[in-house]
Each structure stands twice: as C-alpha cells, then as structure tokens.
C-alpha cells in the first residue's frame, strides 16, 4: 500500500535527498538523520529533489528494514528511525526521524543540527562544542548550577546559606 504524496518544500523538519545517478551515499543520509534528530526530529524523503519533485530511489535503497538498520548502526547512540515506501508511481522512501533526547552523532563523530539560512531555506550544519551544552540544557539533561566554577573558593559562598544547607542535610539524614 502506497500513499500519494505532496512533497511541498524543505523545512527545518523535512529534508529531500536525491538518489539519482550514482545514488545518495549512505553517509549523507545518516548525516541528514543526525541533523534532524538533534533539532526537532522530522522526515527525510529519499528519492525527492530539492524542488520537491519525486525522481525515485535506487534498488539498493528500496528495503526500508535494511535502511533503518544501516542508520541505527551508523549513529551514536543508535537512532531508531521508521522507513517506509511511499510515492505514487515513483518509489520514494520516507524516513521518520524522532527528536533525540540526547546529542547524537554519526559513527565517524559528526554532530549536526538543522537551521534556517538567511534565504529561508533549511540546511544541516555542524553542532559545535559550546552548542552541545545549550542543547543538553534545553532538553533538561544539563544543570548549569552543577557545573564547576573555576577559581571559586569557600569564601565565595554566603556563610548563612552554608549554615542553612548544613541544617537541610542534617534534617534529611535524621529522617532516613
């Protein structure tokens, strides 16, 4: 069963990948999946040109189960995508990518994210080390207040707050 598709245009959560000529290298598909997972998730349509025209997928990419397994094997931690054949007359693979609750990379260590260019079209760009902390914080996985403060000494802490914390800890210990 295949559903007819209106592909529209690329967005932050929708990426088109051509599979014509020599076919799309697996590494490029994996990078597109990583970028989507590190943003808000979305869909990669394999066999669709940048303008939204369906041109089809090559035989080596027509196995949704194999494609999903290849993506899981080439992402760290493994991304569990759902791939399915779609398209009316022209076979296209729709790869549904979940939003990751951590930062994911390709097996070769590339960390990417999606962003809008000045002209309003989306692109996949590197995620730099300082952006990783922000991403983890946005996901509620990083507590900035738990980060070490270089050069801090005991004198930097309010003595009244230190006493209050001692009382809280002793109350907690005695209630166990």
For each feature predicted by the language model, list its residue ranges:
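Conserved N-terminal catalytic/coupling substructures associated with nucleotide/phosphate chemistry
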Residues: 1-176
């Amino acid at each position: 069963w295949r559903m007819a598709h209106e592909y529209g245009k690329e967005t932050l959560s929708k990426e088109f990948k051509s599979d014509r000529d020599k076919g799309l290298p697996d590494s490029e598909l994996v990078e597109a999946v990583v970028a989507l997972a590190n943003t808000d998730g979305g869909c990669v349509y394999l066999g669709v040109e940048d303008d939204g025209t369906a041109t089809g997928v090559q035989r080596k990419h027509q196995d949704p189960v194999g494609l999903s397994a290849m993506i899981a094997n080439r992402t760290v931690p493994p991304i569990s995508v759902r791939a399915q054949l779609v398209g009316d007359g022209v076979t296209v693979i729709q790869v549904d990518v979940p939003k990751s609750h951590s930062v994911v990379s390709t097996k070769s260590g590339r960390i990417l994210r999606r962003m809008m260019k000045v002209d309003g079209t989306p692109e996949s760009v590197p995620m730099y080390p300082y952006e990783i902390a922000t991403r983890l914080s946005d996901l509620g996985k990083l507590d900035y207040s738990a980060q070490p403060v270089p050069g801090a000494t005991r004198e930097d802490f309010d003595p009244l707050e230190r006493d209050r914390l001692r009382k809280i800890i002793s109350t907690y210990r005695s209630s166990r």
